[in-house]
Amino acid sequence: NLNFRKVKLKKLKNVPAYSWLKSKKIRVSGSSNLEIKFSINSSIKPNKELLVYRPQKLIIGIGTVSGASYVKLKKLVLDTLENKDLSIHAVKAIATIDLKKNERAINKLGQYLNKPIIHFKASELNKISPQLANSSEYVFRTVGSHSVAEAAALVAAGKSSKLIVEKNKSAEATCAVACLSLIHI
């Protein structure tokens, strides 16, 4: 479970890290028991006493065959997030290899999620080959990188990131999820 932390609202005064909250003009009485929880997990649900903030910390790495089905790719991604208890609202971006810039399914997924798609050259993805949970000689021979989904997610998420969902695959696509540093919310 990757929950961040609980914060009592009345303790937020003069805390710069929570300036996003002040700008939202949320009115709460001084005696309120409203609690704020930072979480990327979908199982944490808001209620009248709990405000759930979903920091955008997840990068979805995607690899597909040419002409992959958008419906099947979307199902793979949504099922992966659901099965790992990850909130779609915590997704920051989609990452893939530059050879997929014109891949309809990936571009439609970016539109559906309303998230940017980050493209990397195979040489950039290969720089992190030792960190990968799964690498493939077949993928290397095909696109020039030992991995697309895992590598793209990790490269996009940055140096202090962690792969939290290894490559999950269907007949036409792969996806993996990396989490940006949990330290900086």
Language-model-detected regions and their locations in the chain:
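Conserved mixed alpha/beta catalytic, RNA-binding, or beta-rich assembly cores of soluble enzyme
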Residues: 1-101, 105, 178
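General beta-strand structural signal in soluble alpha/beta enzymes
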Residues: 38, 118-121, 163-167, 177
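Long, charge-dense
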Residues: 97, 106-147
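Short, solvent-exposed coil/turn elements at secondary-structure transition points
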Residues: 123-125, 169, 181
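Internal helix-turn-beta structural module
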Residues: 132-172
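Short, amphipathic C-terminal "tail helix"
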Residues: 174-180
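Conserved small/polar residues in nucleotide/adenosyl-binding loops
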Residues: 183-185
